[in-house]
Structures are given as structure tokens and as C-alpha cells.
């Protein structure tokens, strides 16, 4: 019976994704379909509703809408262009300089906003036209932007790490944030190395060398934005506030920068930005809620034990098992976003 439930759950999910049904609804429908094999329809409906509500009944999830709103404010508040100017000063004379600027700006913006999507939109939207004008292949520019924006998923604060903390049974958010720095930086450096090799082969131009005065100006302009990282991470690691409280502080700080200091965001723009954040938050939280329900259905059908037995049948070496899990995540990540994966 368990094998039929597993086949129904995953088969229904992949068929729905393949025909274009949104992932959150694909997860929800597949979960309901599998539960109908375990319970009568009325109990299945009640159970799915309860699991969805229970999955969202967590104080730590408050961090997600706040960080999303902070990222939306940053995207429109002139923070991205200041980080781009700082990155250009840092790597302006390196082959493929605008590509390296893209990577560094994505790393800095992602570490501030906690969102890869916000970083890709803000940095790519600003740099791609400039790169095209300088003779960069648009496909190359897009590839660099997409490859580097995902560093924001690792370099704290990161919404994905918060979601993982909840789904993994309460792993410390502060520990996950600290663990995210090294792989995020290494990933960014790897993209920069490949970018430099390709740029040198294609003969992409260098940027003009910045004067000391220009470098100081770029640093001072970007400093208020960069301070947000130290405020958020320093507060979390120092035990001053939790991740949820830090996200609220990030919104207040970003609001002051974007609306009151830089004045790039007008008061009349706020309702639109709030609505954008609400839509994005709704999508993420719906994914989390349905994913919790799907996890419960899998556990109730002993699917995790089946997967565990299959993995242990291949090898009992922890490194091999981790490698297999990463291969599975790589394949699954082709079809769906990081949060439901």
C-alpha cells in the first residue's frame, strides 16, 4: 500500500508540474490525492487543512515577509546602484570587469536583502544594458547574473536558510547563517574565475580606473547599505534579537535609507511595493504550508524510511549519502524552486 501512496504522491506531482500547474498547487493536489488513499475524503480534507495551518504556525516565519519587504524596498531605493558603483571600483581593472561587478553586486545585495530574485532583478536590470553597450554578449551577461544571484540564498540573511531551519526540526538559524558565508563566497569566487577566463578569451573591455576620490565616494555612498549586514548579523549572533526581530529591524533601516535619506522611494510608491511584497510572501508561505502537508503525508506512508533504506543499501558512508542527496536536489532543483525542494 505504501508503494501505491508514494507512486500517487510523486506521480501526480510531476504530472501536474509538467502540464504547467503552479508548484504550490501541484504539491497540494498531490498531497490530497495521496491522503485519499489513506483516509476517507472528509478526513483527508480536514487533515490537509490542519497540516497547512500548523506548517505556518511558527514565529520564525515572520522573518520571511519582513525580509521580502526589505528586499523590495532595496530594489527600488537606490541601494543596488550604490553597491554596483562600489563593486566597479573594486574590480574595474580585471578582465571582464562588468561581469565581476555583476557577481560582487549580487553577493552584496543578496547578503543584504536575503533574496536571490530581488538581487537578480536589481543588479541585472541595471547592469545588463550597460554590458550590452560595452560589447558584452547578452547571453553571457544573463548567465553571469543568474549564476551569481543565487549566492544570496547562502550569504545571510537568507529566507531559504530560515525555511530549512523550520523543516529540519528547529536547527539554529544563527548557526545556519554562519555556515552560509563560506560556501556563498566560494560560489561567487568560482563564478568570477569562469567569468574572467571567458572575458579574456573574448576580449571584453576593462572599465576605467577609478581615482582615490572616486573610490572613497563609492565606499561612503555604499557604507550605510553595508551596515545593515553588521546590524542584522551582529544582533542575531550576539543574542540581542532573533531572526524574526532582525527582519523587522531590516525593514525599518531600509525604509529610513530608501525613503528618508536617499529619497529614491516616494510615499506614493509604498502601497505598490507593499502589494508586491504581499504577493511574493503569499507564494512562499503557500509553498511552505503545502510542503509541510506533503512531508506529513510522506511520513505517514513511511516514504522517508523507504528512501533511507534505499540509500543505506547503496552505501553507509555519510559522505556518499550526502553526495546522493545533493544529486537528488540538483535534479529536483531543475524543475522547482529552492523553497519547495
At which residue positions do the language-model features occur?
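Alpha-helical transmembrane segments of multi-pass membrane transport proteins
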Residues: 1-341
Amino acid at each position: 500500500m505504501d508503494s501505491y501512496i508514494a507512486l500517487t504522491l510523486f506521480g501526480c506531482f510531476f504530472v501536474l508540474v509538467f502540464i504547467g500547474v503552479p508548484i504550490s498547487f501541484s504539491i497540494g493536489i498531490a498531497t490530497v490525492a495521496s491522503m485519499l488513499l489513506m483516509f476517507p475524503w472528509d478526513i483527508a480534507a480536514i487533515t490537509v487543512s490542519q497540516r497547512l495551518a500548523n506548517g505556518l504556525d511558527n514565529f520564525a516565519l515572520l522573518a520571511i515577509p519582513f525580509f521580502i519587504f526589505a528586499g523590495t524596498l532595496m530594489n527600488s531605493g537606490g541601494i543596488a546602484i550604490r553597491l554596483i558603483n562600489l563593486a566597479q571600483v573594486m574590480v574595474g581593472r580585471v578582465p571582464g570587469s562588468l561581469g565581476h561587478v555583476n557577481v560582487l553586486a549580487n553577493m552584496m545585495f543578496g547578503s543584504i536583502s536575503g533574496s536571490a530574485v530581488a538581487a537578480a532583478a536589481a543588479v541585472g536590470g541595471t547592469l545588463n544594458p550597460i554590458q550590452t553597450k560595452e560589447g558584452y554578449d547578452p547571453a553571457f551577461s544573463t548567465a553571469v547574473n543568474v549564476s551569481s544571484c543565487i549566492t544570496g540564498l547562502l550569504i545571510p540573511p537568507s529566507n531559504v536558510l530560515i525555511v530549512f531551519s523550520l523543516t529540519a526540526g528547529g536547527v539554529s538559524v544563527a548557526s545556519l547563517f554562519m555556515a552560509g558565508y563560506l560556501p556563498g563566497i566560494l560560489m561567487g569566487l568560482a563564478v568570477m574565475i569562469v567569468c574572467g577566463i571567458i572575458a579574456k578569451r573574448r576580449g571584453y573591455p576593462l572599465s576605467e580606473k577609478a581615482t582615490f576620490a572616486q573610490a572613497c565616494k563609492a565606499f561612503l555612498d555604499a557604507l550605510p547599505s553595508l551596515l545593515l549586514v553588521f546590524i542584522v548579523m551582529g544582533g542575531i549572533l550576539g543574542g540581542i534579537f532573533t531572526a524574526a526581530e532582525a527582519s523587522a529591524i531590516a525593514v525599518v533601516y531600509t525604509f529610513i535609507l530608501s525613503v528618508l535619506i536617499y529619497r529614491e522611494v516616494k510615499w506614493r510608491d509604498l502601497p505598490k511595493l507593499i502589494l508586491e511584497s504581499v504577493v511574493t510572501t503569499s507564494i512562499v508561505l503557500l509553498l511552505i504550508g503545502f510542503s509541510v502537508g506533503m512531508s506529513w503525508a510522506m511520513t505517514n506512508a513511511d516514504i522517508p524510511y523507504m528512501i533511507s533504506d534505499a540509500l543505506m543499501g547503496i552505501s553507509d558512508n555519510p559522505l556518499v549519502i550526502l553526495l546522493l542527496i545533493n544529486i537528488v536536489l540538483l535534479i529536483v532543483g531543475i524543475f522547482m524552486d529552492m523553497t519547495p525542494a
